[in-house]
Amino acid sequence: MAGRKGGRAKRRKVCFFTANGITRIDYKDVDLLKRFVSERGKILPRRVTGTSAKYQRKLTVAIKRARQMALLPYVGE
């Protein structure tokens, strides 16, 4: 098989929270959490969003808490 020619170079994604100086992810901030949930209601992985491992863990906990408090739906619409 021949190697791939051309194409675009992949750009490194920057962590949203590190870039904006956000240190605490609040489960009550539904608008922020919705950015990291798919239209089906699943938590988007790091390779899609570009968040760092530290903030991905905090984000997951915040989304799960928001779901438990009925601020976010478990399933998409």
From Swiss-Prot:
It comes from the Bacteria. Signal peptide: none annotated. The keyword Ribosomal protein applies. Coiled coil: none annotated. One of its GO terms (cellular component) is cytosolic small ribosomal subunit. Binds as a heterodimer with protein bS6 to the central domain of the 16S rRNA, where it helps stabilize the platform of the 30S subunit. This is Small ribosomal subunit protein bS18. It comes from Bacillus cereus (strain ATCC 14579 / DSM 31 / CCUG 7414 / JCM 2152 / NBRC 15305 / NCIMB 9373 / NCTC 2599 / NRRL B-3711).
